[in-house]
Design a protein with these regions (language model features):
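Non-catalytic substrate-recognition and accessory regions of acyl/acetyltransferase enzymes
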Residues: 1-156, 174-183, 197-280
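Well-ordered, non-membrane alpha-helical segments in soluble/globular domains
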Residues: 158-174
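Short acidic, S/G/P-rich loop/turn micro-motifs used as interaction or catalytic elements
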Residues: 152-161, 190-194
């Protein structure tokens, strides 16, 4: 996969592409080869990311990091083909780079790549987007597990969620059979125990919540600020928008000294059965 072909395939904005290419042309990628090779391997990706950061030096807009990661993504294409993973999953997975650039632009008005600390998961082929949801192969409670992530552009209807879960089960059974029977879990503001009182039972969020057995409450977590309001976690409540009913309700909580927080839950076995996923 050529870099230009990849960027066209994931819809990378032209201004971001030009910035990234300018930084890439100034880099000596051969000096980064060791770190880039380790970035592509699940066991060494996290450490390699930190080492690569140090090697790249000053990188205020993180376009050097973006260029290195996208070069690795180009190499991933052959690995996808060797495993029999479709082009659809490849491009859907790697569109995370475009999505994150867009989220940062919306939040700050700048073209900055601020998610390199996350996207090494896609680079190392431990996280895939299958339909509307993302699935990360990891460990949970000492065992192999699948962490479910909800992209900001996901169609969150119950039908699409169920379709994604079914396809993920089929994908794992075929491509990564060691994870076919793994437990599915999710850690998100969408699973906050306090969210249920703010939403109608007919809402997509409530229908997503009831798929999980909530096992941990994180009342101090504030990551929801970005997803609900598009703001940084330390933004004063007075400055938060009130364009949606959820924004208004959560803002009222903050005004009253409360916090939405987050929760962690395990996908209920009966729902896994209904989705066609295998059981232990």
């Amino acid at each position: 996969m050529e870099l230009q072909q990849l960027c066209e395939g994931i819809g990378l904005p032209e201004d971001a592409y030009q910035k990234m290419m300018k930084e890439k042309e100034a880099l000596n990628l051969s000096e980064m080869e060791k770190q880039m090779g380790r970035l592509a391997e699940a066991k060494t990706a996290a450490e390699a990311y930190r080492q690569l950061e140090n090697c790249l030096g000053r990188d205020e807009e993180h376009m050097k990091m973006l260029s290195c990661q996208l070069v690795c993504v180009c190499r991933d294409y052959d690995r996808y083909k060797e495993k029999g993973i479709s082009d659809e999953i490849y491009f859907d997975t790697m569109k995370c780079f475009t999505r994150f650039l867009g989220e940062c632009r919306e939040r700050t008005g700048t073209v900055v790549f601020d998610r390199g600390w996350w996207t090494y998961r896609q680079v190392s082929m431990t996280l895939f987007r299958i339909g509307e949801l993302e699935y990360e192969m990891c460990r949970f409670r000492g065992k192999k597990a699948i962490s479910i992530h909800i992209p900001s552009d996901a169609d969150f209807t119950p039908e699409k969620v169920q379709e994604s879960l079914k396809k993920a089960g089929e994908f794992l059974e075929k491509i990564y059979p060691d994870f076919a029977d793994a437990e599915y879990f999710c850690e998100s503001w969408l699973l906050s125990p306090r969210l249920g009182a703010l939403m109608k039972d007919s809402s997509n969020i409530r229908k997503f919540q009831i798929l999980f057995q909530i096992e941990e409450d994180m009342p101090q977590d504030k990551e929801y600020m970005e997803w609900v309001f598009g703001k940084m976690p330390d933004t004063p409540w007075q400055e938060l928008p009130e364009q949606t009913s959820l924004q208004r309700k959560v803002k009222e909580m903050l005004k009253n000294g409360e916090n939405l927080g987050a929760g962690a839950g395990v996908l209920r076995e009966d729902y896994r059965m209904n989705s066609g996923n295998r059981q232990e």
